[in-house]
Amino acid sequence: MRALISRFWKTPYQPQRLARWGTELHDRFLLPHFVWQDFEDVVTELNQAGYPFDSSWFAPHLEFRFPKYGDYAVRGIELELRAALEPWHVLGEEGAPGGTARYVDSSLERIQVKVNGLPPDRYAITCNGVPLPMQSTGTVGEFVAGVRYRAWQPPSALHPTIGVHTPLIFDIVDRWMKRSLGGCQYHVMHPGGRHYEVFPVNAFEAESRRLERFFRFGHSPGELDVGVTCTDPEFPFTLDLRKI
């Protein structure tokens, strides 16, 4: 922060026109891949201005803010699941004992799906049977997408009639053979149905909880015809399971 203040003190940031990102702020910029890409641009600009920085110094911060849920690989296709950002809405006023309250809808979460070595003409990535709008990152065979889902169902939330979407089942589907090559599952809570009674005491316990909620099995059996991938023109990187 001090380096940025010093850099702008010497050379104020005075563009002719600020970029209007529109819905991209709630689409690709919520995914850790593009957050890190944007951060590396900032580090490069600081180095050009005479402030020696290395983006690898901040790799632990990336892992802490966007923890890895798990990965899966089959036939040279590597799939990685990682936490992403999800802004929560503040609801309207509701009656509460002794007055009124405004609850926060914390039931929604977002997960990043990143794939390497994917031939998009033949294979597709699905979440709960729905094909993901995988977008190229600019690297051959590398694609990324986000999944927005309801993790739990509190008494006060937007769209109260929409149920919980977990566990999330991800499949690597062969479109030609109409079958899943394999897949993985991610559970938001304990897969056995238990409720965590206390908060994790440190980062190691939190990581162990995440790892026990991820399984490298549990793909969809039988014939799968995923059909055509539907992409929202306003949110091309995001699959919102609430709209399915």
What are the roles of these predicted feature ranges?
Residues 1-244:
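C-terminal accessory/tail domains of diverse enzymes
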